[in-house]
């Protein structure tokens, strides 16, 4: 289907393995059936294993993907071998320039096949990828991914578990969106497993077509192990994989505090999580024992240490909300590559045509809501509501709304955004003159980001929305003080002098 993830076929790795002949003669296996060896830009040695039913030989292919016929950066310890098991030591000189590759031709028993060796360029950054992969579960990472996808023109492969977040048919043609059976709901565990295998196959296809390709992975920080599982574990050199770990929202900050907020366990926890990551085979691929359900891709404890490794970064709304008073963890925080990027900044930076495409992807009617804000010359104020478990809670919310209208109604048009589960506010427009009720079921984050220049004040019940809103836009909160807020809102608002605390 147009704009949907194409059905990916498993590559027959004929370039690395001779299949059994029709008469049943044994096959030759190169590197246990893989068809390439990928290493970083440093001077390194690797191995190619050969398991052959007859004597074999290996030569450099004349074309070598545009390189010299006999590159001086690649040395083989043997150019022929006997039947049975053999090993070839492959030595790479340090690469001071662009990525390079060469094709080795193995001949055995009258059959010839190619094996690719490649060496990455040094110093490539997060803007270097030739192909992008986006995998997300939470809403916030999905929105980040959609915004970034529209900021470049590279081929992209996309999966988001909350299928209703975007309309897959509205993605650009260069983006292949993995389909789900229920586009109004969530991807099933079976669909996530199938998606993962399809993504891994596509990565190997791209590597076979373009052995020096650089990959970009944008992934929930809670699923950051996919940077290893999908790429490095399949043999792709980690320097060719630029991983942006996207904040899942409050979980990013709360998990950091839970893991490293206790001085008695913080250092041990950090070292334990670091040891798990470093136990992986980062130089040549391999497989770390899987200790989690594969359909969840979970790696909650890894993103913080991973952000200290090359080619990994943690992108979040506000890095200053990650803090520690313990010297050991404070030092580790300083070593973490964190980028504070607000989604509205990504949206603002897009060309107008790309903004409109994002709104279509997100099923957001910009013109409709912008029109509401332009109906009068007054400034615009939004109140954020909450859910309720009692009549008293419903009455308290109504009292807050009445107070805000009395306090600001003469200078502001008042808009109320109910919680999706709140039905008590349905009668507010009749009860409170001049109040406009916004839809409870709407992409509210996108509403705020898209119309930020038209929103003069926002406030209400504590919400994760405030993490991605400029602090100077927040005028009031329905709470006693910052200390009573959940993390990281307690840190965000502890020095906010402009916020009025209402209880």
Protein language model features and the residues they cover:
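Solvent-exposed, low-complexity, repeat-rich "mucin-like" stalks and linkers
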Residues: 21-26, 33-64
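Donor nucleotide-activated moiety binding/catalytic core segment of transferases
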Residues: 192-201, 423-470, 489-493
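Conserved catalytic-core segment of nucleotide-activated headgroup transferases in glycan assembly
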Residues: 356-371, 381-422
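Surface-exposed binding patches on compact interaction domains or structured appendages
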Residues: 53-89
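Bacterial Sec-dependent N-terminal signal peptides
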Residues: 13-38, 109-126
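A nucleotide-sugar donor-handling region in carbohydrate enzymes
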Residues: 272-382
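Active-site and donor-binding regions of nucleotide-sugar-utilizing enzymes
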Residues: 131-170, 174-309, 464-467
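A short beta-strand micro-motif common to beta-rich folds, especially ectodomain repeats
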Residues: 88, 98-110
């Amino acid at each position: 289907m147009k704009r949907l993830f194409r059905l990916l076929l498993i590559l027959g790795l004929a370039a690395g393995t001779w299949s059994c002949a029709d008469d049943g003669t044994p096959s030759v296996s190169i590197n246990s059936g893989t068809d390439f060896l990928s290493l970083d830009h440093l001077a390194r040695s690797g191995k190619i294993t050969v398991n052959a039913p007859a004597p074999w030989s290996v030569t450099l292919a004349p074309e070598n993907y545009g390189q010299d016929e006999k590159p001086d950066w690649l040395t083989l310890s043997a150019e022929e071998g006997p039947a049975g098991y053999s090993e070839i030591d492959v030595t790479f000189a340090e690469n001071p320039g662009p990525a390079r590759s060469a094709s080795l031709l193995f001949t055995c028993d009258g059959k010839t096949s190619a094996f690719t060796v490649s060496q990455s360029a040094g110093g490539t950054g997060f803007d270097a990828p030739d192909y992008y992969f986006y995998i997300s579960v939470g809403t916030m990472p999905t929105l980040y991914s959609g915004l970034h996808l529209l900021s470049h023109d590279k081929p992209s492969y996309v999966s988001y578990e909350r299928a209703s977040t975007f309309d897959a048919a509205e993605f650009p043609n260069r983006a292949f969106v993995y389909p789900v059976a229920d586009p109004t709901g969530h991807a099933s565990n079976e669909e996530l497993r199938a998606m993962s295998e399809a993504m891994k196959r596509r990565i190997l296809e791209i590597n076979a077509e373009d052995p020096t390709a650089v990959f970009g992975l944008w992934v929930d920080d809670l699923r950051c192990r996919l940077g290893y599982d999908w790429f490095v574990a399949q043999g792709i050199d980690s320097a060719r994989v630029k991983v942006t770990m996207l904040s899942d929202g409050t979980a990013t900050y709360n998990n950091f505090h839970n893991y490293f907020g206790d001085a008695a366990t913080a250092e041990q926890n950090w070292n334990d999580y670091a040891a798990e990551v470093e136990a992986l085979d980062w130089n040549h691929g391999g497989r770390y024992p899987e200790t989690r359900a594969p359909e969840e891709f979970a790696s909650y404890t890894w993103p913080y240490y991973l952000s200290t490794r090359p080619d990994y970064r943690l992108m979040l709304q506000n890095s200053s909300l990650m803090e520690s008073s313990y010297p050991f963890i404070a030092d580790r925080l300083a070593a973490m590559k964190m980028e504070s990027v607000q989604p509205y900044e990504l949206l603002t930076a897009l060309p107008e045509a790309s903004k409109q495409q994002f709104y279509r992807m997100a099923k957001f009617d910009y013109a409709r809501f912008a029109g509401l804000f332009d109906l009068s010359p007054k400034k615009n104020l939004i109140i954020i509501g909450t859910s309720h478990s009692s009549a008293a809670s419903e009455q308290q919310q109504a009292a807050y709304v009445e107070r805000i209208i009395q306090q600001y109604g003469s200078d502001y048009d008042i808009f109320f955004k109910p919680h999706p589960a709140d039905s008590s506010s349905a009668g507010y427009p009749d009860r409170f003159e001049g109040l406009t009720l916004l839809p409870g079921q709407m992409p509210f984050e996108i509403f705020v980001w898209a119309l930020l220049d038209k929103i003069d004040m926002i406030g209400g019940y504590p919400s994760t929305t405030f993490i991605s809103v400029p602090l100077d836009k927040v005028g009031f909160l329905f709470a006693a003080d910052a200390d009573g807020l959940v993390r990281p809102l307690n840190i965000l608002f502890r020095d906010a002098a402009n916020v009025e605390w209402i209880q």
